[in-house]
Amino acid sequence: VVLLTGGAGVLGRALIDELSQDFRIVCLRHRTPVNDRRVREVRADLLEPQLGLHKGEFERLAAEVELIVHSAAATNWKSDPGSIRRANLDGTVAMLDLAARAGAPVYHMSTAFVANPLAPEEQERFPGAAAYLASKTAAEQVVREAPVPGVILRPSVVMGDSVTGRIAGMQGLTRALGAIVKGQVPVLPGAPDARIDMVPQDVVARAVGGLLRGGVTEGEYWLTAGAEALLQREVVDTCLEFAEGYGPRPHPPRLIPLESVHRLLLPLIEGPTFPESLRRRFHTYAELLLVFQRALPFESSLGSPHCGPALSKDALRQALVRNLTAWSAGRGGMRAPRRTQQPSPGAARSTETRELAS
């Protein structure tokens, strides 16, 4: 029996698809029902003693559970920083307490971006992102120190399914990519060669399933694209090529190095001259893309035992196009395509993307 938290989320849905083939699944959920016949739901609160359950319920749950996959997390960076920390750190402590009672290993879903600590200036400007990364770093430490077996899982940004492109919820990065397709992003923070490390949800779920089936109960695993991650200019050009299926190729956004964003652009647009909607949008993009600005690629455990095959640039580009196709058919509000969309087989046309020098 696998206890899963976060089953109603993007990754949680993919984990149910993957794990329900071989495991009975009990989903702890708070407000949002999972509504999936393949699982049994238990309403609980990770921030309450004994998960908010009666003593007998808690003890029966502990006696039943054999494996714990803790995927629930506060991921909205617009939330109060204190609430982000409580959800991500205290919720992890609660799962470790249950694991100790159950004698079960914990598979803790962290994030690859713990490897990108923010500078003091960035922490002050983006308190939500800072709280999220700090809480994930602290949660990893309590997993390491816990008296139960623990596996730390570090996915990068989780995108939709690699085959269908579908995703359970609209992610911030999906909105940004959709805005590029619509030609609504004149300026984009980040260096052209920054790696936008994204991994399809089914790839992450397959790796987690492989670790559970393989009996792996310790270690740290990077569920990332690693050195194969698409560069920011490649992501932009793929979006522009996709948009050509619906009409004229949008004007490419200017890519502004992050140091110029902090030193020049953010102070400028935070003045009274610019509309509030423009300030909010650019601030969101700057915060979202902040974590991708690193010199070296992430490590990747994909391709190692139990974790499934490694990803290639071509596979990632194809997955991105399928994600854009699913987005356009759903919430994207795009017209019917004028031709069938095909992933670009070669390198994206980076010459179309212009860099504004610092």
Feature roles, as predicted:
Residues V1-D22:
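N-terminal Rossmann NAD(P)H-binding glycine-rich loop of SDR-like oxidoreductase domains
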Residues F23-V34, S110:
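Conserved glycine-rich Rossmann-like NAD(P)H-binding loop of the short-chain dehydrogenase/reductase
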Residues V39-V65:
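Conserved Rossmann-fold cofactor-binding substructure of NAD(P)-dependent oxidoreductases
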Residues L67-S71, K78, G82-R86, D90-A134, ...:
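Conserved Rossmann-fold NAD(P)-dependent oxidoreductase catalytic core, especially the SDR/UDP-sugar
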Residues R85-L89, G128-E140, I167-M170, T174, ...:
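Short-chain dehydrogenase/reductase
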Residues P147-I152, S156-I196, Q201:
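NAD(P)-dependent short-chain dehydrogenase/reductase
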Residues V187-L188, L258-L311:
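A hydrophobic C-terminal alpha-helical subdomain
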Residues A207-H283, R322-G330, M334-S358:
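Mid/C-terminal beta-alpha module of Rossmann-like enzyme folds, strongest
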